[in-house]
Structure formats: C-alpha cells, structure tokens
Regions:
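Short intrinsically disordered, low-complexity coil segments enriched in acidic
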Residues: 1-5, 9, 81, 142-146, ...
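N-terminal capping segments
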Residues: 1-54
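Generic hydrophobic, helix-prone segments enriched in Leu/Val/Ile
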Residues: 1-4, 34, 100, 116, ...
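Short linear sequence motifs
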Residues: 8, 56-59, 131
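Glycine-rich catalytic cores of cysteine/serine-nucleophile enzymes that process amide/ester linkages
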Residues: 11-13, 17, 40-50, 95-136
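...with weaker cross-activation on analogous glycine-rich loops/strands in unrelated enzymes
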Residues: 47-116
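Low-complexity, Gly/Ser/Thr/Pro-rich intrinsically disordered linker/tail segments
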Residues: 115-121, 128-162
C-alpha cells in the first residue's frame, strides 16, 4: 500500500474518472500479500489487462461478494467487527441506501482509530475517523488458498510483472 499509495503501478490501469480506483488499488494490495488470483470466469478475482479483469477486481460490491464467498484458490475474507481487524484487512464505506462505494485497506492503528490507504482520493495513513459515511463493513483476511508455490512479491511490488 505504501509503495503505490500516491502513484500508479505500471502493471495496472487507473480507473479514476470511470468509477474510481479504490477497489483496484486494494485488490493490488491484497494480491501483493497473497500472490494468487482466481481465474474463475464468472466469479473470479483477477487482472490480466484493462479489458481482461474480473468485476471483483475493481468493483466494491463484487470484491465483497468474491472475498466473503470464495471457496476456491485465492484470498478469502470474512465479515468481522472493529476489534477483529489487523494490518491488511479491508474496510468498505456505504450510504444510507445500503450501497457500498469505497474500499480502503488498513495500514496502521491509533489508540482509537484505524489508519487506511486508498486510491481515488489518494491517501496513506489517513485516520478512518476523517471519512464521512453512513454505513461501514469490516473484512478480515482469513487466508489464501493456492495450488502452486507462491513467489511473486518482488517483481510485483517493483512494477515489473504480475
């Protein structure tokens, strides 16, 4: 999250201006920690190119649906409560209509707050309490399932390869 908080990885399209880049950014962060994508055609979580990506890679609701229901390869998460959050966990903000519109990743803690990183409005170490929202949900990364050895971090974090 720190490496690309205020810039864009050359490996990924920016979706600012066409719905926002927040979930794309958080997906990149989750991928940096898991190194596994799920290429399931209709219900996957993957990015190969700007035109070959899963809705869950860039869409707030699709991301939530994939992460909380994934039983295949890749990362999986569960709904949790504020006290159950750890570094790398995810927060989503919503409105009174029940629509969730923003995805953030936890990068630190204060005694009574979370520090988050996000894109669309690029931030790093921003206190969650400075956001305005009507609804909130918390996602804890439970783990990652992989069917091959995992080794992608260095090339990925340096913007060299997915």
């Amino acid at each position: 999250a720190r490496r690309w908080a205020f810039s864009r990885s050359p490996l990924f399209e920016s979706y600012n201006g066409i719905g926002g880049d927040c979930t794309n950014f958080v997906s990149q962060c989750v991928y940096a920690g898991s190194c596994v994508m799920n290429y399931t055609r209709d219900f996957g979580w993957y990015y190969s190119s700007p035109v070959n990506r899963a809705p869950a890679w860039t869409g707030v609701e699709f991301f939530y649906n994939f992460m909380t229901a994934n039983e295949g390869v890749g990362p999986y998460m569960s709904d949790t409560y504020p006290g159950g959050l750890e570094l790398g966990d995810v927060i989503q903000l919503g409105n009174t209509d029940g629509d969730f519109y923003h995805t953030l990743i936890i990068v630190g803690f204060l005694p009574d707050d979370y520090l988050v990183s996000a894109h669309s409005n690029d931030v790093f170490n921003r206190p969650l309490s400075t956001y305005e929202y009507d609804r909130i949900r918390y996602l804890h990364v439970e783990g990652v399932r992989a069917d091959y050895p995992i080794d992608c971090f260095d090339g990925f974090i340096n913007g060299e390869r997915i």
